[in-house]
Amino acid sequence: VKTEYSVVAHWPGPFDEDGLQEWAENLRAQLLAPEVSLGLVFMSPNFFPHAAQTLEVLRVHAQIRLLAGCSSHGLIAGEEEIENSSGLVLALYSLPGATLKGVHFTQKQVEEAADKDYWPRTTGIEPQHPNGWLAFVDPFHINSESWIRSWDEAYAGLPVFGGLASGNFPDPVTQIYLNGDVYEDGGVAIAIGGEVALTGVISQGCTPIGETWTLTRVEQNLIHNIGNRPAYSVLAETFQGLPPDEQRKSQGNLFIGLVVNEYLEEFHRGDFLVRNLIGGDPKSGVLAVGAMPRTGQTMQFQRRDADAAT
C-alpha cells in the first residue's frame, strides 16, 4: 500500500545486509512523498552487534534525513504487536513544513541541569522553536524522572512523547539511536517544529490488580523487596491470585503503578504513575522497572486494559 505521509513495516529476521537493503528500498517506494523527513527504528536485542551497520543501511536505502529510535524487547508495526520476537520495525514519515533536530543527552547533563536555561543552552534549541518532542531514553544509566522534570521546566508546555528502551533482562544494556550513532546510555530527543504539531492519544489504560504494597528495598530502578518480601514473589503471588480469565488477560500486560499522592486514604485507577515492568529474576527476586522509585513508596501492580482506555 502506497501512502503520502507515513508507512511502517516489520523486518522479522536476523541481520542480513543485502536483504535489509532491498527491504528498505521497497519500504521507501511505498511512500509517495518526495523525501523522508523522519525515520523511527526499533530493534530487538539480537541486533545489538549489528546496530550501527543496520542504521547505515536504513539511512541510505530508505533515504532518511533524520533517523532515531531505540532497542525494544517488543515491537509494534501498525496494528500488529510483536512480543518476544527478533527483528526490527521501521516507520518512515514525510512531514512537509516541519523543522527537525535531534540531540543526545547524558546523566551527567541531567545532574548539571540546575536552571531552566541549561537545556536550551546545551542543545541550542530555544523554548519557542519546537512544537513538541519525541524522546527515547535508556532506563539503566539515566534518571529519567529527573530528566523529564528539568526538561519540562526548560520547555514548559511542550508535549514529550516516546518511551524507555529495553533489552534482555537481567543484562542492564539497551541501545539508543540517532542517525548513525549507537548509544548505550542517556537518551535522544527530537525537536519537532515548523508547521507540524504533536497530539497524543491514549490507546489503552491500566487497571490496578491485587493489593497496594510498600517498597521496602530499592536500588535505582531495581526493586528488591516489596513488603519485606522478594519483589518477584509478590508479583507471582499477585498473578496467581487472579481469576483464570484475569490471568489470561494479564499475560504480557503487567505494569507497576507508583502512587502519586501518598496522603490519599484509598487508591484507585488514576492515582498511579504507571511504569513498565522491564523484567524479573525469580532467583534473586528482583524486578526491574522503567522508573526510579524510592524506598517507602506505595505501589500496586497494574494490568493493561483495553476497557480502561480513555
Predicted regions, residues:
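Small-residue-enriched flexible segments
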Residues: 1-52, 57-60, 65, 70-74, ...
